Amino acid sequence: MRIVVLAGGIGGARFLRGLQRAAPDADITVIGNTGDDIHLFGLKVCPDLDTVMYTLGGGINEEQGWGRADETFHLKEELAAYGVGPEWFGLGDRDFATHIVRTQMLGAGYPLSAVTQALCDRWKPGVRLIPMSDDRIETHVAVDMDGERKAVHFQEYWVRLRASVPAVAVVPVGAEQAKPAPGVLEAIAEADVVLFPPSNPVVSVGTILAVPGIREAIAEAGVPVVGLSPIVGDAPVRGMADKVLAAVGVESTAAAVAEHYGSGLLDGWLVDTVDASVVERVEAAGIRCRAVPLMMTDLDATAQMAREALALAEEVRTP
């Protein structure tokens, strides 16, 4: 079975680990979000791609869900001693090595997709990890701050400001002019099923869908497209998805997120058992819906979520 997954960072990576357990023989292609990418200290940092790579490759800091295990921060301390920032973004020494290799390869003319493949040669994540685009795309957030409206990089909004100021718009800068990376459209066309993990629907999955051609390819693939709600009991399972959902005019409910994706894209939608009352509303929108446990408490629970998603895909496939 060929499965395509549109993945952001922590939520997407953890779901993928469960999917590998649930479908060990599947051929999995991950289309990774690059809207979170940022240039720091002269280096190209790809947080979501790296989180997927480290998580599936066994190098992730399990407790925080991002960054490397057994990390040290000597480089960060030395930069701070020179008065060089930003101090709010925590790059560790091991992590720096990844960004140095990536930046060197990009500087030598390799596209991001080829660089990502080279980095994965070390980590062996067990999936094919492709960035959504080789073109530079950065998500910016328009915020009202200090009495004025300004645009900040998504990482500054998320990490430094902790989404504490009102967001009025979320814009994937560069997406309109971007092209899908080599292999992205082909993977979608050859897929047996497409999955949207419980990643952020605006700044993770939504950013991937903003690259011209990707949304259309999924809608036209003619295979089941199943998503899992990142909202449980009217609140994000993790992160601050409610803040960016509000910025695009979507309420923080499992049903509203399904409607945001729409029946033109989604065939099936999983909500948590606490949201069982919305199943009827989602189905009225033309999307098959089931209520199952959606908390990724451990690998077994996550694998069961993946099994439920694949089962719903089969249900949708067989009228």
Swiss-Prot record:
The keyword Ribosomal protein does not apply. It catalyses: enolpyruvoyl-2-diphospho-5'-guanosine + 7,8-didemethyl-8-hydroxy-5-deazariboflavin = dehydro coenzyme F420-0 + GMP + H(+). Keywords: Magnesium, Transferase. 7,8-didemethyl-8-hydroxy-5-deazariboflavin binds at residue 50. One of its GO terms (molecular function) is magnesium ion binding. Its EC number is 2.7.8.28. One of its GO terms (biological process) is F420-0 metabolic process. CDD domains: CofD_like. It comes from the Bacteria. Catalyzes the transfer of the phosphoenolpyruvate moiety from enoylpyruvoyl-2-diphospho-5'-guanosine (EPPG) to 7,8-didemethyl-8-hydroxy-5-deazariboflavin (FO) with the formation of dehydro coenzyme F420-0 and GMP. Homodimer. Belongs to the CofD family. PANTHER family: 2-PHOSPHO-L-LACTATE TRANSFERASE. This is Phosphoenolpyruvate transferase. It comes from Streptomyces avermitilis (strain ATCC 31267 / DSM 46492 / JCM 5070 / NBRC 14893 / NCIMB 12804 / NRRL 8165 / MA-4680). The lineage of its organism: Bacteria, Bacillati, Actinomycetota, Actinomycetes, Kitasatosporales.
